[in-house]
């Protein structure tokens, strides 16, 4: 009997250790400046303090921020690598990107429309040239690899949320004169005969998995896109543009999250997205913008489980 009691007490004592072993980790990327001045000026960097406030309130202890000049493609990839290396089973991970988006030629031939959707790091050029073929664009193919690597580390009990306050298309007319749009209407066209962009993209993915020590290549560039084994919140539908708030000059999706999380504790994902869309609609004057939620994990855990204590 005494042995059973001791065993039971030991089990109880072990529970807090297991609970505390779960770590909340975040990577926050915000861009309001670009090395290539052909990109229109936006305020993605101003989103970062709002996101930091959300994460602090939600109890995130490990937060990496990359703002403007620090958010190069190499810097972002390195942050993903460090995040993956640090993650453990059951961790909660939040990835936030505020910046430009652009479509470019799908060099891996795995997209139905022939276009990759890209995040735009600090050192990415807006147009292809004799010396630039999309090497610094961060494609959805690469992002899927990095995010799936994190998912594999945190396991089935882990939670992964990705927020993208950008869009992958734009409108040259920009609607109202003072509208600031995150995204551009032109596609970066890569010459299929020029393999430079493909090579660097492939090498980045390869080194992420196997390093530079010549181990067997585990990446198949012709494979279908990896599954979206997380929840993604995007600022708008693919056929819409993402227009910033006028006051304050920040991302509309980021500001909606910051505002609504102050007013709500824990609700289901459908209800939470309903509130986010309602906020965006209230603050949209020129063109419709509807935030979207996608991913295989939509019914597995709640967004507010991640972004609140």
Predicted regions and their residues:
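Bacterial N-terminal signal peptides that target proteins for export
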Residues: 1-7
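Bacterial N-terminal signal peptides
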Residues: 7-16
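Cysteine endopeptidase catalytic domains of the caspase/legumain-like
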Residues: 21-309
């Amino acid at each position: 009997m005494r042995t059973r009691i001791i065993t039971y007490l030991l089990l109880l004592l072990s529970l807090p250790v297991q609970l505390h072993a779960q770590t909340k980790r975040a990577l926050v990327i915000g861009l309001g400046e670009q090395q290539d001045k052909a990109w229109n000026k936006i305020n993605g960097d101003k989103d970062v303090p709002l996101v930091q406030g959300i994460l602090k309130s939600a109890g995130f202890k490990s937060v990496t921020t990359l703002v403007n000049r620090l958010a190069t493609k190499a810097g972002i990839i390195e942050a993903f690598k460090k995040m993956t290396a640090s993650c453990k089973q059951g961790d909660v991970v939040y990835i936030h990107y505020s910046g430009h988006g652009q479509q470019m030629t799908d060099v891996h031939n795995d997209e139905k429309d022939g276009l990759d959707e890209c995040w735009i790091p600090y050192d990415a050029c807006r147009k292809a040239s004799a010396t630039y073929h999309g090497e610094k664009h961060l494609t959805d193919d690469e992002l899927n690899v990095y995010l799936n690597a994190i998912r594999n580390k945190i396991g089935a009990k882990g939670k992964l949320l990705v927020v993208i306050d950008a869009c992958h298309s734009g409108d040259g007319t920009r609607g109202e004169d003072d509208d600031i749009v995150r995204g551009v209407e032109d596609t970066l066209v890569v010459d299929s005969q020029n393999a430079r962009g493909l090579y660097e993209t492939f090498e980045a993915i390869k080194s992420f998995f196997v390093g530079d020590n010549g181990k067997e290549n585990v990446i198949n560039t012709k494979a279908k896109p990896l599954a979206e084994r997380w929840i993604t919140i995007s600022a708008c539908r693919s056929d819409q543009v993402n227009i910033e708030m006028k006051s304050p000059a920040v991302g509309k999706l980021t500001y909606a999250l910051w505002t609504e999380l102050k007013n709500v504790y824990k609700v289901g994902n459908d209800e939470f997205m309903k509130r986010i869309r309602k906020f965006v609609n209230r603050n949209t004057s020129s063109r419709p913008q509807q935030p979207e939620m996608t991913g295989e994990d939509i019914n597995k855990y709640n967004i507010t489980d991640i972004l609140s204590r």
